[in-house]
């Protein structure tokens, strides 16, 4: 009997090479699969993640569809898997779903990027980008990020190579971007149904450089959003990026 279980997962991505299985590196999915296999004593199962987070990216609400071939006592089953997992990965919640549940049918994903523009903190440094310049004017920075809200051509703001552009839908819509100040930290919130490889980190790096009037202008950003020109080399560290929430379509 095929059983589907929807897992809500949180993890510190610092020690992992992203979500997806890697041949020669340790990933979140590989580590989760290892823990599940230890509990059920078989390789007859499958995990599918809703978001392919990159190396050093963290998550508070990654969604994972687990397909197994028996019906467990859910609470005990999840407790056993959590016990087998390392301390930097944890299942927060689980529920039975149809095994054919489409985990890619996402209404929206919310990512947060954390910037410390106050005082260096060794205890939070692995979860944020330390800003070495003057305190950020969030109103000024918000005006730059507003250029990216809505439907645009994002191929020049992605990690895709030129020969990959035709393989992906690079014309995308970002529903909202908010620049917030929370507890002496700047939090940049992105909301969209999906993102291209490295898209958020490349957008942030370009906006911060435009904010500093460093090697790029807002005029150039507008042109790039039309697919005009070339990519810049700017990409911000992954460690400040957190997958905050995934919301599925209700129908």
UniProtKB/Swiss-Prot annotation:
InterPro entries: PsdUridine_synth_cat_dom_sf, PsdUridine_synth_TruA, PsdUridine_synth_TruA_a/b_dom, PsdUridine_synth_TruA_C, TruA/RsuA/RluB/E/F_N. One of its GO terms (biological process) is tRNA pseudouridine synthesis. Gene3D superfamilies: Pseudouridine synthase I, catalytic domain, C-terminal subdomain, Pseudouridine synthase I, catalytic domain, N-terminal subdomain. GO terms for molecular function: RNA binding; tRNA pseudouridine(38-40) synthase activity. Belongs to the tRNA pseudouridine synthase TruA family. It catalyses: uridine(38/39/40) in tRNA = pseudouridine(38/39/40) in tRNA. This is tRNA pseudouridine synthase A. Substrate binds at residue 111. Its EC number is 5.4.99.12. It comes from Mycoplasma mycoides subsp. mycoides SC (strain CCUG 32753 / NCTC 10114 / PG1). PANTHER family: PSEUDOURIDYLATE SYNTHASE, TRNA PSEUDOURIDINE SYNTHASE-LIKE 1.
């Amino acid at each position: 009997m095929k059983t589907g279980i929807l897992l809500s997962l949180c993890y510190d991505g610092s020690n992992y090479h992203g979500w997806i299985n890697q041949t020669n590196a340790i990933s979140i999915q590989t580590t989760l699969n290892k823990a599940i296999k230890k509990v059920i004593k078989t390789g007859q199962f499958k995990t599918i993640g809703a978001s392919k987070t990159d190396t050093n990216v963290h998550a508070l609400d990654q969604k994972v569809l687990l397909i197994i071939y028996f019906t467990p006592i859910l609470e005990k089953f999840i407790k056993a898997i959590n016990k087998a997992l390392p301390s930097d990965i944890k299942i927060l919640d689980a529920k039975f779903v149809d095994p054919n549940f489409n985990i890619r049918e996402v209404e929206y994903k919310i990512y947060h990027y954390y910037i410390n523009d106050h005082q260096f903190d060794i205890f939070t440094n692995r979860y944020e980008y330390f800003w070495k310049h003057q305190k950020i004017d969030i109103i000024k920075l918000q005006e730059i990020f507003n250029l990216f809200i809505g439907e645009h051509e994002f191929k020049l703001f992605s990690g895709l190579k030129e020969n990959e552009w035709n393989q992906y839908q690079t014309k995308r819509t970002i529903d909202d971007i908010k620049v917030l100040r929370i507890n002496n930290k700047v939090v940049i919130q992105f909301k969209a149904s999906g993102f291209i490889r490295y898209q958020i980190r490349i957008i942030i790096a370009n906006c911060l450089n435009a904010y500093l009037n460093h090697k790029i202008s807002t005029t150039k950003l507008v042109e790039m959003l039309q697919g005009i020109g070339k990519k810049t080399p700017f990409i911000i560290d992954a460690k400040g990026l957190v997958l905050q929430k995934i919301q599925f379509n209700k129908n």
